[in-house]
């Protein structure tokens, strides 16, 4: 087993590290103190392919490997935990389930928008009693009378205003 990084992985790690030091670290304290979402930083990460690192190019991803994704999360997390979690949740909790379990139609519809950063993935664990147990949630959705729209009773905040 070869435990060395490839030349491409070394270059990506340097790019991630430089980006983290130059773009993420200077804002990290402000992000934490203000409980802010670093929207401009996320846009820059998307332009560098960091919002879809290991997904195939045919779905808008960068076409790199999982180790490259892990290195990006690691480098961002070294300087700003929030930014590391943004990449991690977006990729692992939103994009990956679509890529691994979605239909071809779903992959072609959702992944390009997610990998480009046009949409940012999220994952909610908000039910009383569910805590961090995603399987413990009880929320259900039912089709409306016309069979066209799903109805789900939930509480939302301004954070969901831009969600599709």
Give each language-model segment a name.
Residues 85-105, 131-134:
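N-terminal glycine-rich flavin-associated loop
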Residues 133, 149-150:
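Hydrophobic, small-residue-rich alpha-helical packing segments that form membrane-like cores
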Residues 155-160:
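Conserved small/polar residues in nucleotide/adenosyl-binding loops
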């Amino acid at each position: 087993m070869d435990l060395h990084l490839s030349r491409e992985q070394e270059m990506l790690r340097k790019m991630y590290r430089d980006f983290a030091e130059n773009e993420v670290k200077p804002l990290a304290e402000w992000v934490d103190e203000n409980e802010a979402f670093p929207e401009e930083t996320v846009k820059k990460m998307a332009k560098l392919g960091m919002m879809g690192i290991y997904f195939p190019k045919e779905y808008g991803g960068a076409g790199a490997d999982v180790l490259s994704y892990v290195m990006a999360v690691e480098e961002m997390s070294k300087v700003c935990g929030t930014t590391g979690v943004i990449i991690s949740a977006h990729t692992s909790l939103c994009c990956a389930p679509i890529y691994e379990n979605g239909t071809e139609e779903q992959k072609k519809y959702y992944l390009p928008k997610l990998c480009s950063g046009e949409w940012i993935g999220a994952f909610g664990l908000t039910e009383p009693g569910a805590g961090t147990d995603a399987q413990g949630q009880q929320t259900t959705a039912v089709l409306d009378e016309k069979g066209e729209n799903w109805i789900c009773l939930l509480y939302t905040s301004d954070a969901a205003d831009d969600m599709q």
